Amino acid sequence: MRIANTFLTGTLVLALLAGCKKETDPRVPPSMSFRTGSGYTSGNDTVPPADTLLIGVVIDKTEDPLIALNVSVAYDGAGSSTVENLSISGEHVEHDQQVIARAQAGSEEWIFSVTDRDGNITTRSLTLTVQ
């Protein structure tokens, strides 16, 4: 009888532990997309040297408040350099970045990263090929 009670108690404890799930933060990052429409560059493109472009991003909060937007550029596959680092807030942010392509042939990767209060980061990039 004692073995049966021990077995039954052990089974009940395991069932209770298996039934309890720890709630976890889904860590949903902010949403960000490139602005489309007349006058905006919203995807990879081939451009002439020293061309002036406008890249726009639309950012929406998911769970946590937005805190920062970083714009960086990487030339010819090298490491990136920060062009602009902005403090942002609110549930919806739209940002336009005027870009002047280099006067020499090569590639430019423009990288936009948004961070929320929990440290969730969303990154979008596009590549300009200067010819």
Regions found by a protein language model. Give the residues of each.
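Bacterial Sec-dependent N-terminal signal peptides
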Residues: 2-5, 10-38
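First exposed extracellular module after export/assembly in secreted or surface-exposed proteins
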Residues: 28-131
